[in-house]
């Protein structure tokens, strides 16, 4: 059986193809009309071409109006040929348009395929109907055959029942014969025989299938001996009275023996129960975990490791040392609170301070107050930005080191110890040297303090000079003389950051940004030659 063909679905699928064919035919007809109109010749030919063009135009309008479903249905019903339709004198524009669409090669192939599928579908249905009719004719014959087969089966069953009956009778006859032969031997044997012989027919009745083949053969030979046991059957009734007397004692004997076997079975588990050794072994096993429990004391000793808070406390003590140093530089407190490590750090810092003071004395010649003024005008912009312009390499480097001043406790103490008289002398010397700034010279000076590896070097004095030298490049000559005086006071305050903090505390947001930048700028210090620009 082929799959069920739904014609409506096929018609719907062909709608797109019909629309395509419509477009193609309209284009073809328009081209044909243009050619007919462009042709030249006699007046009769021109009129004839005009009439043909008019007919083609009518066909185009009718093609547009036709529905795709109507085209496919008519093409499936009839065998349309365009030549026959055109030869008809009475053919309308619609008929010609429909013939054009149906005979188009794109549509014609699909319509022929559908027609073939319809034929195959019909043929399959016809063959299926014929096959069903043949089956209906064959069914009554099968029923009759079944009925005929049932009859011999019933005959066989009847024969089997008759054979079973005859076998039972034959067994009874044999019993009677045996009873008569053994009557002389004794009453005891006579009682046992019927008991055994009567059980045989019961077994044969239960297992009908087993004795069928064996018992059917025996009576076929011994059938003529039916008359003899007919007289001796009443002899079977006598032992039937004595059978229950034999059976009763046989049932009582095993009933007495069973409880005798069960009693010793109860005594044995009574001996096995007093197993007192197991709990005795388990009790000392409890003592071992008791020994393991005091081992918990070790983690208890390890937990109070107060090393972490011990590291944090000296970090808190350092800022506490800084505040009293600003008021009065008392050196008695740090040795009491701090361990010997702090003493070594202070000694190193003092050594650094001496070297820095020597460097500052050498650099007094290059101090320029005008550059310092410019530096202070742009100090806010330098502090906000992470790094200065691309040209200001040293400024960025010095600014990062300057930001570390808050962490360095020793550096603040040294700066406070430096007397303000020296700073005033430096500023006066620098002001004298301002007119000689035109003659600029470059020198390379080697500093021992820079070449040495120090744990915490302080570049406070050098920072100001570096920034001043680098800040000479940006041109800011228009600085009012009134603005110079407060800037000079600022310059003195830069050298002593402790005093500046007392005068003007920073905004918390500035402090936070400064701390963040200090963390970012924790890089290795510049260790090498210091470049100095001579005026």
Swiss-Prot record:
The keyword Calcium does not apply. Residues 128-435, 453-535 are annotated as: Disordered. One of its GO terms (cellular component) is perinuclear region of cytoplasm. It comes from the Eukaryota. Residues 128-151, 159-191, 205-325, 361-376, 406-432, 460-472 have a biased composition (Basic and acidic residues). Its main location: cytoplasm. It is found in: Cytoplasm, Perinuclear region. Residues 5-27, 107-177 form a coiled coil. The keyword Cell membrane does not apply. May be involved in regulating transcriptional activation of cardiac genes during the aging process. May play a role in biosynthesis and/or processing of SLC2A4 in adipose cells. PANTHER family: SERUM RESPONSE FACTOR-BINDING, SERUM RESPONSE FACTOR-BINDING PROTEIN 1. This is Serum response factor-binding protein 1. The lineage of its organism: Eukaryota, Metazoa, Chordata, Craniata, Vertebrata. The gene is srfbp1.
